[in-house]
Amino acid sequence: MAWRSGLCETDSRTLKQFLQEECMWKLVGKSRKHREYRAVACRSTIFSPEDDGSCILCQLLLFYRDGEWILCLCCNGRYQGHYGVGHVHRRRRRICHLPTLYQLSFGGPLGPASIDFLPSFSQVTSSMTCDGITPDVIYEVCMLVPQDEAKRILVKGHGAMDLTCQKAVTLGGAGAWLLPRPEGYTLFFYILCYDLFTSCGNRCDIPSMTRLMAAATACGQAGCSFCTDHEGHVDPTGNYVGCTPDMGRCLCYVPCGPMTQSLIHNEEPATFFCESDDAKYLCAVGSKTAAQVTLGDGLDYHIGVKDSEGRWLPVKTDVWDLVKVEEPVSRMIVCSCPVLKNLVH
């Protein structure tokens, strides 16, 4: 008996986009004739199978038959269908401290296919043995941003720009941006200098400016939406199936309070922003402004510190490095968080 599966043109485009752009694939089985991959994705705005809840467990069988590649897809235990495509490119991604992952791309639209069997997938196992994207991973893969490159990344303002300039997307809180490029995502963000990170004691959180400003202003009250994890993160390595607490490693954090003036509740992380004992507020907006602001402009154009009277105080600059993280780690960070993913997809 032949099993047929098809989908409309719109569904074909969105499914292809989801599988290519929102999933990092782990090889879980193979034989001479097939490969089986697994991915765990956070909730998606373009692809939502039934009962997806807050995350989507994707299982994919891939094999070649009669001149085309056949994809058999199962999501959250429900078989979605099988589809044909002319070409499949599998890109192996080896990342320090992480298991090998794959990115899949499909040459042409996903079309209807016919198979003579009902696909069977491997049993799903879930493990917390992999720590995901840790500070060690970030410091290993990040690169300092040269000043000439930083000047070409516009983060505020519009109007006439140099043809070499590119506009980045601001990610929620302070000091983090994403630049979508044809070759993939590039994340730009401020992070504590490595020497300071190794001496500060906390080796679990990624000490981004975004995270530390949120920690400094967190009120800690039960039910505060700014201080509570949104519970939508997933493990980008696919080892753990389900939603996980973020553990201070995402760039989705925002200050607890108005972006223009958030009260400092926790002194220890606040010391990374200002030397003065008079510091009362942290601001996710700069004490200086201009019609156009680039990453090459000073830190005073991106953040600020105020005293109790609302006067601007000097911002610490020597403790921060402006770094960039590129594919595939940038995509893993974005696609493990529904907040970040919705900003750029």
From Swiss-Prot:
Q: Which HAMAP family match?
A: HSV_CEP2
Which InterPro entries has this protein been placed in? Herpes_UL16/UL94
The record's subunit annotation is:
Interacts with cytoplasmic envelopment protein 3 and with the capsid. Interacts with host STING1; this interaction prevents viral DNA-triggered antiviral immune response.
Where found? Virion tegument; Host cytoplasm; Host nucleus
Q: Which GO terms describe its cellular component?
A: host cell nucleus; host cell viral assembly compartment; viral tegument
Name under which the protein is recorded: Cytoplasmic envelopment protein 2
In terms of Pfam families, this protein maps to: Herpes_UL16 (PF03044)
Answer whether the UniProt record assigns the keyword Nucleotide-binding to this protein: no
Similarity annotation: Belongs to the herpesviridae cytoplasmic envelopment protein 2 family.
